[in-house]
Amino acid sequence: MERRNITDSPMEIYIHIPFCIKKCDYCDFLSGPSGPKEQADYVDALLEEINAAEEGKGRSVSSVFIGGGTPSVLDERFIGEILNHIRRKFQIADHAEITIEVNPGTADRNKLQAYRTYGINRLSIGLQSPDDRELKILGRIHNYEQFLETYRSAREAGFDNINIDLMSAIPDQTYEGWIHNLRTVAGLDPEHNSAYSRIIEEGTPFASRTLNLPDEDAEYNMYEATAQILREYGFEQYEISNYAKKGRECRHNVGYWIRQDYLGFGLGASSLYGKERFANTQDMKKYLENSRTPEKIREKEPPLTREDEMAEFMFLGLRMTRGISKAEFERQFGSEIDAIYGDVLRKYKSMRLLLEENGRIFLSREGIHVSNSVMADFLP
C-alpha cells in the first residue's frame, strides 16, 4: 500500500468568513450579519490561527478558497491581510487557483480590482437566479441588474475565470422558467456554472413555510436539461452539480473529491490532513478567545481507518463524472477494488447505475439521480 499525503504532495487551504448582510431564507450555512468591530475581531483571530498552524510546513499549496458566508462583505484590506499571512506561512504554488465568493451588490469595481492585486484569480458569484421574483422567494438581497453590474465590473477588473451559482427547483419555479434561467446565464459566457437543486434544511425559514415545490418528475427533467443546455454553450458536466468550459474546472473542489489534503481556517472550518479529519468550533466566543492555540478550537474525529479511506475514495470520487480509477485504488490501498467492493459493484452494474470503461468506474445518468443511495453502500 502506497503512503498517502507525503509532505511533497500539494495541499489546499480554505478560509471561512462567517458574515453576510442578511441570511437567505434557505441557508443553513454557518453565517450571519455582523458589524465592523465583529469583523475586525474575527479577522484578527483568523490571522492568529493561521500563524499558529503547525501543519503544512514545506507543502506546496495548489489552491486557496475564501468562502462563507459572504467574504465580499469584508473591507478589501482584510482580504489582503489574510492572503498576505497565507503567503508568509505557506508556499503558494505558481499558478495556484485562488478563489473568493462574491455576492452581487457587495463588491464594486474598486474592491474587485483590489482582489486582483492580491492575487485572486477566480470569482464565484452567488446569483442563484436571474429572475427577480425567484430571488425574492429565496430571500436574496440583490436583483439581477445588481448581479450584471458585479459581473461586468469583474470582467473589467481582469477576471477571466468566473463561476456563477444557480439554484433549481425553487418554489413556484417551472421547467420553462429553469430553462430560461440556464440560457440567460450561459449566454453571459462565464467559465463555470454550479447548478444545485434546492434543499429544504431544518431550522431555516423555508422549512417553516408551506411551499409550492416542483414535483420529482419536474426536478428530474430540470436536472437532465441542465447538462444538455449547458453543453450547447460549451460547458461539460464534470461533477454532479458542476459544469465548466474546457480546463476551467474548479481545481479546489476537485481536490476535495480526490481526497487531497486541505487545511481549513476560521469558524467551523473543516480539514483533512493525513489520516485526520477535524473541524473548528462553531462557537464564535470560543474561537475568538482561543484561535492562537489551534488544539483548543479543533474538534477532532477518530483517525481514519483504511476502511474509512477506501470508502471516501469511492463516494467522493463517484461525484465526478469521470468516476474513479481502479488502478489508482490499488495503488493507494494495495488491494484490487473488486476484492473489497465486488458485491456492491456487481449489484449496481447489473442495475446499470454504475458503468465501467477503460479502467474507470462511474455513475450512469440514472445512477446520478440515486447517487446518495449508491454511495451509501460503500460506507464501512
What are these regions (language model features)?
Residues K349-G359:
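A short, conserved structural fragment
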Residues P18-F29:
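Local cysteine-cluster metal-coordination motifs and their immediate loop/turn environment
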Residues Y14-H16:
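Short active-site neighborhood of thiol/selenol oxidoreductases, capturing the structured segment around
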Residues S335-K347:
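Short amphipathic alpha-helical interaction segments
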Residues R360-S364:
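Minor-groove-contacting beta-hairpin "wing" of winged helix-turn-helix DNA-binding domains
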Residues E366-P380:
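Short, amphipathic alpha-helical interaction segments positioned at domain boundaries
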